[in-house]
From Swiss-Prot:
NCBIfam families: PRK00029.1. Its EC number is 2.7.7.-, 2.7.7.108. The active site is at 265 (proton acceptor). This is Protein nucleotidyltransferase YdiU. InterPro entries: SelO (IPR003846). It comes from Nostoc sp. (strain PCC 7120 / SAG 25.82 / UTEX 2576). Keywords: ATP-binding, Magnesium, Manganese, Metal-binding, Nucleotide-binding, Nucleotidyltransferase, Transferase.
């Protein structure tokens, strides 16, 4: 009996297969993709299903079975064509024309209950014409890490993809940077679009300005619909993309998130965060923290992320000049820093409890906060969580009480900065009445959840899987993230 025969293959009963899929990208023609076949796997075990996002697809989680997930996204029955998307990209600043979906494909596109178009994109589903000698597979740990990153960022308010499901596939993989053989998985990502900056860069490489315009019209039609009937829709599209990307990177920075691989092929044309590889959340405020061991010169370190995203947007201008006036794009890009700075300041103030502050106070508080965090190397997440945990309305009346019951212990030599910060925070609180201070307390709790996704936390969830096939710590961690515990 084959693996497929052990599962119910009556596709008409599988709500994941009978969704109303739209051939939006497929209708563009095969200049943008290759039709591929999914790999066959020796053993399929459902390890994760994201019931939280099924209602957005119009599905009741109670009627979608584990078997439905395996049949749809492990056996890949009932969906054709499967599309490996073509793209190029700047990787660590160097143009690479040998890219494309090398271990995944576009499974399908479906309209959500919100009227938006969503992609189901696989990772680890087998070789494609763009695998470049790779096996087309995803390690189980890679799948686990992407699930955790997406859920954590979503709860922190970052515009991000989500993981719909993760299935263990029974293959042993050999990887130079992991103990091998290591276990394997297929992960299905749900996001607005898998069209990347590098999708346009590839078309420019082949001098296909006609295909650039066709793709740009498609992007505006489906993802910037409010611009579709504007006379200057192309320039407005680029200006809005700049704003989306600037706000996205500000969201990363406030969350203490380091993406690690900000190549142009990892930049979404919708301004979403996706494709999580060797990412990390900063343990302490070190501006030059670098997440990827192979980023030898720190190109994608934490503090460089805004400038790198701005550079990526500048590189995108090259293919888009086939449609959009260069001066219009430069005018749009000129606002990047303004957008990023405004979003970052707003988010950081919220982490400190404030919806808004007068500019001088806001800048002084943010500057002093980052100065203390950098000099003291107190945990980045710990600092804000301890504010939320120990906040008292009495902080308004007495500066000596600010953070007095917390676990924040400033190292020797940083006491003065800490004291200055406490005095300033008290001074600002004193401008608010008691009812407003209660709202500040609520903001602190909302924007600073207890659970953080530092690397040791991920390892604590992963090691029981490796040692005992015990998934409970992983499930507990996901539950804690989703509940903002």
């Amino acid at each position: 009996m084959t693996l497929a025969e052990t599962f119910n293959t009556e596709n008409h009963g599988n709500p994941l297969i009978t969704l109303n899929y739209e051939p939006a990208l497929e209708s563009l023609g095969n200049d943008y993709y290759d039709e591929v076949t999914a790999a066959e796997f020796p053993q399929l075990t459902l390890r994760w299903r994201n019931d939280a996002i099924l209602p957005r697809l119009g599905l009741n989680p109670q009627i979608v079975t584990d078997e439905d997930f395996i049949t749809a996204f492990g056996l890949f029955q009932g969906r054709k064509p499967l599309l490996a998307l073509r793209y190029h990209g700047y990787q660590f600043g160097e143009y690479n024309p040998n890219l494309g979906d090398g271990r995944g494909f576009l499974y399908g596109q479906v309209r959500g209950t919100d009227g938006e178009l969503y992609d189901f994109g696989t990772k680890g589903s087998g070789r494609t014409p763009y695998s470049r000698g790779g096996d087309g597979m995803l390690t189980l740990k890679g799948g686990v890490r992407e699930v955790l990153a997406a859920e954590a960022l979503h709860q922190l308010g970052v515009r991000t993809s989500r993981c719909l499901t993760m299935i263990e596939t029974g293959l042993g993989l050999w990887r130079g940077d992991e103990p091998s053989p290591t276990r394997s998985s297929v992960m299905v990502r749900m996001n607005k679009s898998h069209i990347r900056f590098g999708t346009f860069e590839r078309l420019h490489y082949f001098q296909r300005s006609d295909l650039i315009k066709k793709l740009l019209d498609h992007v505006i039609e489906h993802y910037y619909r409010h611009l579709a009937h504007e006379s200057d829709k192309y320039a407005l599209f680029y200006a809005e993309l700049v704003k989306r990307v600037a706000e996205l990177v500000a969201q990363w920075m406030a969350a203490g998130f380091c993406h690690a691989v900000l190549n142009t092929d990892n930049m979404s044309i919708t301004g979403e965060s996706f494709d999580y590889g060797p990412y990390a959340f900063i343990p302490t405020y070190n501006p030059y923290f670098t997440a990827a061991y192979f980023d030898y010169y720190g190109r994608y370190c934490y503090i460089q992320q805004p400038s790198i995203c701005q550079w990526n947007l500048e590189m995108l201008q090259v293919p888009l000049r086939a449609v959009i006036d260069k001066a219009d794009m430069e005018a749009g890009l000129a606002k990047f820093s303004e957008y990023c700075h405004a979003e970052y300041n707003s988010l950081m103030l919220k982490k400190l409890g404030f919806e808004e502050l007068k500019t001088p106070e806001a800048e002084e508080l943010l500057s002093l906060t980052l100065k203390f965090l950098q000099e003291s190397q107190v945990g980045y997440h710990q600092f804000f969580y301890e504010m939320a945990r120990t906040f008292s309305i009495k902080w308004r009346d007495e500066p000596g009480l600010v953070l007095s019951g917390s676990d924040i212990v400033p190292p020797s030599g940083t006491d003065a900065n800490f004291d200055n910060w406490c005095v300033l925070y008290h001074k600002i609180l004193n401008n608010f009445d008691y009812e407003q201070v209660k709202i500040i307390a609520q903001n602190l709790t909302h924007y600073n959840p207890k659970t953080s996704l530092l690397r040791p936390t991920i390892e604590e969830a992963w090691e029981p899987i490796v040692q005992e096939d015990n998934w409970q710590p992983f499930y507990d961690l996901v539950k804690s993230i989703q509940s903002r515990g």
